[in-house]
A protein has these predicted regions:
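Short, solvent-exposed loop/turn elements at domain surfaces
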Residues: 53-61, 72-75, 83, 90
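Membrane-proximal, proline-rich intrinsically disordered regions
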Residues: 18-67
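Short linear capping/connector segments at secondary-structure termini
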Residues: 27-30, 156-164
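Conserved, well-structured interaction surfaces
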Residues: 41, 81-152, 162-169, 180-190
Length: 190
């Protein structure tokens, strides 16, 4: 009996003592991505993919959210609960509605990633590439904030913990400022 207890005690201790973190050797770190030319170009191109591909993308959620809330779309499959909630509207829309949550979260992810690209634009040394990437990232940043302000009363303009929420007027002004910042690059961007 003692041997069995000692064996289980040893097995229990060995399970909780393991502190190995296995990293994917093929996945670059954030520092690697934003400190190299190819990484920054890849991150900028990834904005388009994040924006447009999949049911969680802002393209899908914008069309679905606005279409069902304004009765421009019709629900053919009542099994799509999130879309059915939007169609019914009012208190039937739960706080766990995937369309609304994806619109919020994915737009903020795109906003944050675009800002990271803009913050590290100095990595690019070729003026045409720099201009193109700056304009590309700025457009996606502006689309993210512009989308959020269409659907929500207040939106955070920082992507930090406990970021404050800004009014629609402030968000629209920031969106316009983002787009105006591209004017100096428009002559050289591809």
């Amino acid at each position: 009996m003692k041997k069995i207890i000692v064996l289980f005690l040893f097995l229990g201790l060995s399970l909780i003592s393991c502190d190995a973190e296995f990293l994917d050797p093929t996945k670059p770190t954030e520092g690697d991505v934003f400190s190299s030319r190819s990484g920054l170009i890849g991150a900028a191109n990834g904005l388009q993919s994040k924006w447009s591909i999949g049911r969680q993308s802002p393209v899908y959620t914008i069309i679905t959210g606005s279409g069902f809330t304004t009765n421009e779309l019709r629900l053919l499959n009542a099994g799509n609960v999130d879309e059915a909630e939007l169609l019914t509207g009012g208190v039937s829309v739960s706080s766990k509605n995937a369309v609304i949550n994806n619109l919020w979260s994915q737009s903020l992810v795109i906003y944050a990633e675009a800002q990271k690209v803009l913050d590290n634009i100095g990595v690019i040394s070729v003026p045409v590439e720099k201009a193109s990437i700056f304009v590309h990232a700025s457009i996606y940043k502006a689309m993210a904030t512009g989308t959020l302000v269409q659907f929500f009363e207040k939106v955070p303009l920082q992507t930090t913990k406990n970021a404050g929420f800004s009014s629609r007027a402030d968000v629209i002004a920031a969106t316009i400022a983002t787009l105006k910042s591209t004017e100096i690059y428009l002559g050289t961007a591809n």
